[in-house]
């Protein structure tokens, strides 16, 4: 098996294949520059956590991994990021293309196929392709693929965090799996897929598992995000006793974190329901298994066809 840095070349469409020269050899192609890409946040802790995760992934892969955000993070003051400005995707791709780094690998730090990956990323690659025709950008798969039902690694990470958050008071807790919320139905389907996997993994150790979101757009077209977390606590069985809020979040930000919206919603629910004892889990980004999954996604994507320029 070739090393993860080797990219497969495409055979000629017609005629005999010429003998490889050093310039044509697959092994002569330099390793791709790897970008670990998240959505971006105005919260400095998110960028700092992304950098730490990229460093761990780089150690696992044996080559540097650059932390990059789709948007937003470049608006965080550099002084709050240790004096090093955040990178966002479009200028990050162009900077590397100008430097002659023609082989790029985008590793999404996303649970599912958000519009940032299915629309924004291809548009950026297409815009650059006209100016840098040798540029080749490959993209790894998201962390969760409902079509690959046998892959339960993310659900396993969340289950580990739920078990760690359980109080051991006796009665099984209820679990609310909460994500950011999305206008994209396929992203909502990932949350529900994970909720089903989580229920299967936890079994009789919990009394129920419910998927919920932090936010949604108005209108019935976005009802797949329901219930919102604040409403979930008002459902039967979720407003009393031990309830573990399982964070389907990768990095700290406005919603997730010790002083985020999730914590405030839990505190408000506790005031409404006197017998409620809510607890929250660690972020998925804190689980050591995430680096292994990202490394697998990275190696797999080295053989993918480049995005169309």
Q: What annotation goes with each model-predicted range?
A:
Residues 1-309:
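Extended amphipathic ligand-handling, pore-lining, and cofactor/metal-binding catalytic surfaces
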């Amino acid at each position: 098996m070739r090393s993860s840095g080797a990219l497969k070349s495409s055979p000629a469409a017609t005629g005999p294949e010429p003998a490889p020269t050093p310039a044509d050899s697959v092994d002569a192609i330099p390793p791709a520059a790897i970008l670990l890409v998240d959505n971006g946040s105005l919260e400095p802790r998110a960028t700092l956590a992304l950098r730490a995760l990229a460093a761990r992934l780089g150690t696992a892969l044996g080559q540097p991994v650059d932390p990059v955000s789709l948007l937003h993070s470049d608006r965080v003051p550099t002084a709050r990021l240790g004096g090093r400005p955040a990178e966002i995707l479009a200028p990050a791709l162009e900077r590397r293309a100008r430097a002659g780094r023609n082989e790029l690998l985008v590793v999404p730090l996303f649970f599912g196929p958000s519009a940032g990956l299915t629309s924004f990323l291809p548009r950026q690659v297409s815009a650059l392709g006209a100016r840098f025709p040798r540029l080749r950008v490959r993209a790894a798969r998201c962390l969760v693929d409902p079509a690959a039902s046998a892959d339960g690694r993310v659900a396993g990470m969340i289950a580990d965090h739920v078990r760690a958050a359980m109080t051991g008071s006796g009665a099984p807790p209820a679990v609310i799996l909460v994500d950011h919320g999305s206008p994209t139905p396929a992203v909502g389907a990932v949350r529900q897929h994970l909720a089903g996997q989580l229920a299967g993994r936890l079994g009789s150790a919990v009394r129920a598992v419910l998927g919920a979101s932090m936010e949604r757009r108005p209108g019935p077209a976005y009802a797949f995000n329901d219930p919102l977390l604040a409403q979930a606590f008002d459902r039967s069985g979720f407003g009393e006793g031990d309830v573990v809020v399982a964070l389907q979040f990768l990095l700290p930000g406005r919603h997730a974190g010790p002083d985020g919206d999730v914590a405030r919603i839990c505190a408000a629910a506790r005031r409404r329901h006197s017998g409620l004892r809510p607890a929250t889990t660690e972020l998925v980004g804190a689980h050591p298994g995430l680096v292994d999954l990202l490394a697998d996604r990275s190696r797999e994507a080295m053989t993918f066809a480049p995005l169309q320029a």
